[in-house]
Amino acid sequence: MAKKRGKKYQDALKKVDSKKEYAVKDAVQLVKDIAYANFDSTIEVAFNLNVDTKQADQQLRGAVVLPNGTGKDQTVIVFANGENAKAAQEAGADFVGDDDLVEKIQDGWLDFDVAIATPDMMPKVGRLGRVLGPKGLMPNPKTGTVTMDVAKAVSDAKAGQVTYRTDRDGNVAVPFGKVSFDTDKLVENLATLEDIVAKARPASVRGTYIKHASISSTFGPSVTLDLTTF
């Protein structure tokens, strides 16, 4: 049985033409106008792509620093030692460690948003796969979180880097700001995401690549984008 939406959602939904594709700036403004959460809600974009995720070369995964950030303070941890640990601390990492950090997570601590590791630490970090993997926190070279340049990785994470990846149905969902953001800044963030997804088009894909895109705020209805207006 489908979950019945509340009155605030229904009122917001009435302001959206479900048959219309909105120009990007108009869509962003509309989502801001109809947001009703009693906190500064996040705005997210969802791209539906014409990809076969059973094919390894059609699985998208990566990271991008949004020009205007995400509005969220990221708690960043780094698995490193020696000079790399020092560099991570100087770059602003919240927690830096080696075996001690691995043990802390094994004991159930998960109060962080981004995990970064130097390549030599991955055999140890790999033991955390069952914990970090399902939560999307496992360091990965494709997202720039397995790297020797931990200072840059920490700076990027703190500056508003977001990660993206296709789910099994070819969808990519990424947050790109808060309702409180200026409309133009949200549009700039959204355009950055659209550009990175478009450039990541697998060579083997034929026909239309981005089939559909919509944006929504936390709890709010989605608004379909006119992809020609990017």
UniProtKB/Swiss-Prot annotation:
Membrane-spanning intervals of the chain: none
Gene3D superfamilies the record matches: 3.30.190.20, 3.40.50.790
* Presence of the UniProt keyword Oxidoreductase in the record: no
The answer to whether the entry has keyword Transcription regulation is no
Q: Which UniProt keywords apply?
A: Repressor, Ribonucleoprotein, Ribosomal protein, RNA-binding, rRNA-binding, Translation regulation, tRNA-binding
Enumerate the Gene Ontology biological process terms.
regulation of translation; translation
> Which InterPro entries does the record cross-reference, listed alphabetically?
Ribosom_uL1_bac-type, Ribosomal_uL1, Ribosomal_uL1-like, Ribosomal_uL1/biogenesis, Ribosomal_uL1_3-a/b-sand, Ribosomal_uL1_CS
Q: Supply one GO CC term from the record.
A: large ribosomal subunit
**Gene Ontology MF terms:** rRNA binding; structural constituent of ribosome; tRNA binding
User: Pfam families this protein is in?
Assistant: Ribosomal_L1
Q: Name the source's superkingdom.
A: Bacteria
Function description? Binds directly to 23S rRNA. The L1 stalk is quite mobile in the ribosome, and is involved in E site tRNA release. Protein L1 is also a translational repressor protein, it controls the translation of the L11 operon by binding to its mRNA.
Q: How does it assemble?
A: Part of the 50S ribosomal subunit.
Similarity-based family: Belongs to the universal ribosomal protein uL1 family.
By what name is this protein known? Large ribosomal subunit protein uL1
The scientific name of the source species is: Limosilactobacillus reuteri subsp. reuteri (strain JCM 1112) (Lactobacillus reuteri)
Organism taxonomic ancestry:
Bacteria, Bacillati, Bacillota, Bacilli, Lactobacillales
**Primary gene name:** rplA
